[in-house]
């Protein structure tokens, strides 16, 4: 059974708001804008939060991405998450595959993210050397805080995606309590 993205509809949407799964080549919102949305599809993932960002070369649906929300030249920038990262994380819910694309990353709720291996319910998520993907192999400094596997038993490794529960996940490349 393949894992699929939810059918997200904004809660309390404003007129002119860019849809959650919509990619635009025009910046429609300030970077860092956070909205809530509800999955109204058969996947029934409940509610989640999403943050507005720029795309990144090689971005893909389900990719884990680090993002920057501070003002300045890097505002809204994303990077495909990779081992030894140090940034807040989100899941791409649309094909943000260029720095001229604008859209949303999921930062809380039940979602689907790229995974190199199938990890079980409540499994810890770790960054990998494969950009944008995670697995459950314990590596010092690569743990993703506030993220856990939520696959259940019905999913297969072949779809290279895993269901996860996230709550504003982040990584910090911390290898000891002194660094």
Spell out what each predicted region is.
Residues 2-179:
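Glycine-anchored, exposed beta-strand/edge motif detector
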